[in-house]
Amino acid sequence: ADGMSFAVFDGMGGAAYGEVASEIAVQKLRKYEKKLKYADGTRMLDQLVSSFTTEANDAICDMLAEKHCTTGGTTFSMLYFLRDSIKLYYLGDSRIYRYKSDGLTRLTRDHTVANQKVDAAIYTEEEAKKSPDQHRLTLFIGSDHKKLGLNADSRPLVPLEMGSKFLLCT
C-alpha cells in the first residue's frame, strides 16, 4: 500500500459552484498523483500537499471571481500510506476516522468557528456541539482569497495496525 492515497472532497457554495470547486480540486490532485506515489518521506509529502492545496485554492478563487461569487470552495481529507504508517491531511470538516477492535476514533479536528471558540475558552466542548458555529468553516480549499498559500492541517504519522480500517467522510 506504500504510496497509495485516498481523498474526499465536499464542495460548498451556492449556484452549484461547490460542485465545480470540488471538481477543480480533484483535477489538481490528479496532477500530483505520480509525484505523491513516489514521495520519499514526510517532508516531500508535506511540500507536495502544500503545493496542491495552494494551486487548487488559487484556481477555485479565480473561478469564483469570474462568476462574481464571494463564497464557495471545498473541504478536503486525504490518507497517504507511507511504509507501515499513514499520514493525514485535511481542511474543513470532512473527517477521517480509524476503526479497530476497541472502537471508532476520530483522527481529525473540524476547522470551524465553534472549535476556534473552544480554543479561546469562549465555548465549552458541549456548547460548541450545540452552536450554529459548528457548521461555519474557517479553513477549506477556496478560503485563501488573498492567495497567500494554503496549507492543509496534518497529523503525525499514524501507525498501521493489523485489522485497522479508515473512514473518510463528509
Whereabouts are the PLM-identified features?
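PP2C/PPM-type serine/threonine phosphatase catalytic domain
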Residues: 1-170
